[in-house]
Amino acid sequence: MAKRGKKGGIPRAEMVQVASANRDENQVTELKKADYLPYLFNLVMPKMFFKSPNRIVMARLYPDVHKHDQQSAEYFEGFQAPCFDLPASLFPDNAPIDKIVFMPTVMLPMGFEAGGVFGPGVLPRDCYPVDLIRTEHEGPMPPLFVGLRSMNISLASMIDSFLDMYDNPEGEDAFVYEMHATDHHYDDDITEELMLRPDFTLSVAYSLPATMRLPSPYPYPCVQAQDNIYTPDLSKVLMLMPHQLNITVSILSTVNNPHVPSVAFATMCDEEECPTFDLPTDVFPICEGVNRPIFLPKRFMPKGFEACCVFKPGSLSELWFIKRIGRFGTPQQQHNCTITPPLFVGKYSRDGECTDMIEEIRMNFDKKARESAKSIASLTLETLGGLSRHITSTKGFLVMESDKPTPPAGAYSVESYEEASEDGCIAKVTKECASKITDTRDDGINTADYQSQFPELEPEPEPEPEDEGEDVANKKKCLSCFKIDSDIDVMSHAIAELTVAELSMLGEENPVPGVDTELALDQLREVLENRGEIRSNTDDLMRDHIYRMERDLMLALRQPIRKCCECTVNF
């Protein structure tokens, strides 16, 4: 059977449009007991399929991905399902077209008004579309979907924007790499694009939104971007693909998928396995040294992949992106747009369960919306206003209350706790009141017995209570603030002069949602009390490290020099 589904001389793989057809709106058939009835609503077609005059679409299915829905098959048995007449030119005369199982509307892919499936092994090899099967394929033929696209298609905005990357306007001959504008046109055959190959698919890396966090009053310094090594953590990234094949390629973002040093250490560790696979040499150039692809450990891979690797920014040429990605590439945010972006290459796993990415994205958005609403409801306008005013600079860190009129060394005085809070102080230190002196005499002898045995001990009259207003006036508290970069020894000595001090949070009990303030206070208290021991342990660790490095260097220098065959001299 000749190849079908060509448009402009380009064969379509995995999905083909083969013919135009019409259907009567009242044309239905009764759904009988089916051995294979998958749920194909999430089977997304490229947008060019919705613009072609050919309405009949054929797509290869995978039984381990598009599994049989036994519950739906039993429920819809006996229901009326839309159907259409298959054109005689689609299959040979000996094709068992009567074994097609037409599907209910709710189980059809988006944009289809009718469609059916041939189960695994139903179609013989000579009846299966050659565009959708490899020549070296062995075993029974995979299932096949044959559907009739609707005339008027209305897709959701999110799906429509996702399909925009496949839009190919008529008459557009320039294939421009979207991240690096260029005026050069390339006349090479566009069949080199990975999206048009039968063994590749192009994915979109979708990073799930991170949990909402309040803006920190302590701004971190700007980290200089580097391109020497690139190992991102992709465990929270979903790879959205129009159809699932063995190998998929996706452009990554250095902004949304930054380099993670812990992932780099994991790739160099011998204790953790990094699954590998052979990259096709006809697609990817041989990159060695710093430009070689880095294979990631299993725990840092996206869901549904058995092995994956990443090319760091600048390792692949711009010409490779233009010829291999072409018009199907989606622009991604990058820290440096003067070099080519990083690239993800993954091998899809056929053993694991299929991941419903659209449903997972929806659930994640619902979860983040609830968390955001809860966090925003717990904030007050004053808190948000204070954070917005002091987000760029922070002066204080810890406020100490003492009886001394002057602040200790390394601190500055403030008038009130409100002023300390506005300066950024989050913790306070106060002096604990001394407990009342208790009577240590034997509880078995009461006061009357003491007075009878020791008449010289007369009870002293209780002192008259002093005026509280006068006491507050005489003992005015002094508030001193320490900065975030203050000397910890000076801070500890000032706190030690209070004799008995209490460390607590300033203001609310939990001013920073999502942070264990009790644990943070315990760690700060431990640092203040045991700073000498911590320094000593750190010094011992550094000395041991230096000793091991010097020992390894000496052992390396003692190794005999091995000469190669070219250095050997025969006398």
UniProtKB/Swiss-Prot annotation:
Leader sequence residues: none
Ranges annotated as biased composition (Acidic residues): 457-471
Keywords assigned: Repeat
Repeat is among the record's keywords: yes
UniProt-listed InterPro entries: DM7
Highest taxon in the source lineage: Eukaryota
Annotated spans, Disordered: 440-472
UniProt similarity note: Belongs to the DM7 family.
Protein name: DM7 family protein CG15332
